[in-house]
């Protein structure tokens, strides 16, 4: 089980993803914007940040950069529905960040998250 912070501004997508990740055995906290997500990263340790790239206030790329400074070792996965934004996230995101383009299958999301978490072990030191 991993601790995942989900930052997604679309309410239905956020609820859908959160529910799917909990069913996959992960502990999930979710927020609807980058600023709230950053505050939560400062207060708690997470294994993975799953962030939409396009959000109000602070986009997912800036959130990921700041999250990596606050919590070195956090893994980052971006989700986006825009091809150009996906390329930007891949080029400007933290080292090792992955990009998953919408639409995607939940199996694909869970498989990619599990693969990321297996690379080094949980960032928080918990299993």
Which stretches of residues belong to each language-model region?
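Acidic, metal-coordinating helix/loop segments flanking the phosphotransfer/catalytic sites
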Residues: 5, 29-48, 69
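Conserved acidic carboxylate
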Residues: 8
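Charged docking surfaces used in two-component/phosphorelay signaling
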Residues: 15-23
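Acidic catalytic/metal-coordinating carboxylates
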Residues: 33-36, 59-63
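Active-site residues of response regulator receiver
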Residues: 52, 80
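Receiver (REC) domain active-site loop signature in two-component systems and cognate sites
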Residues: 55
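Alpha4 helix (beta4-alpha4-beta5 surface) of REC/receiver domains from two-component response regulators
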Residues: 62, 75, 82-101, 107-111
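Receiver (REC) domain switch/output surface
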Residues: 109-121
């Amino acid at each position: 089980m991993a601790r995942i912070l989900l930052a997604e501004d679309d309410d239905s997508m956020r609820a859908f993803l959160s529910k799917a990740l909990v069913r996959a055995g992960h502990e999930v906290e979710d927020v609807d914007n980058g600023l709230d997500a950053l505050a939560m990263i400062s207060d708690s340790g997470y294994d993975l940040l799953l962030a939409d790239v396009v959000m109000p206030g602070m986009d997912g790329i800036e959130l990921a950069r700041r999250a990596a400074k606050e919590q070195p070792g956090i893994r980052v996965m971006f989700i986006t529905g825009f091809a150009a934004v996906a390329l930007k996230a891949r080029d400007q995101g933290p080292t090792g960040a992955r990009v998953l383009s919408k639409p995607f299958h939940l199996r694909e999301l869970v498989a990619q998250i599990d693969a990321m978490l297996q690379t080094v072990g949980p960032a928080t030191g918990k299993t």
